[in-house]
Amino acid sequence: YDGRGKSLSEFEDYDDVAAQKILGRSLISSELGCYLSHYGCAKKFLETDADYLVVLEDDIQVLPNFKQKLNSLISYLDQHKELEWYVVNLAAKKKKLAKDIVQIDGYTIWHAYYFPIRGVGLVWSRAGAEAFVELGKTMQVPVDIFFQSWLSKNGKGLGVWQPFVQPAGIDSDILGTVATQGIKRKALENRSASHGFKKQKRMWRDRFYAIRNLLS
């Protein structure tokens, strides 16, 4: 879903008051478009009888042995239903507040208690997609922040290390055409004076949830 160039009022499920309260800023249209793309993928997945959904953003680099590793990952998860996971992050930049589950096929699967912010490659379970569709309809934060906060709180996120995919290294067009017009992102986001404080508050809250789940 390409949200670039659209006004915020065109997104009927966007709550700008909540965004300002949580983030201290507004979302920009391309962030909302990205959110809707992920949400739409989850909804379409639930209309099928598939057990798992792989979501890859279009600006990624697929790392060596991707298909082999992905197949072994899904095979392992399919044989270990007791993990009761929602989402696997395939693109973690680093491991934070994590607990290893198993090493197979040259990589490690781990409990991502502090769920990685980089959401360019994900694997969904049906339970995870159902929960996202139910809880995530109203857009209040960028989708990667939603995933990090939600999965750090419920402890149902997993990760792989080394990552299977990574950003391609090209500049994201998250600002769309306005980037070429010299409009600063800060102004576009309508940041309040509390933006920095709220960012730190959110980070420490999510880390608290992660530590609690790690120690439980």
Provide a role label for each language-model segment:
Residues 1-56, 60-216:
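An acidic/histidine-cluster motif and surrounding catalytic segment
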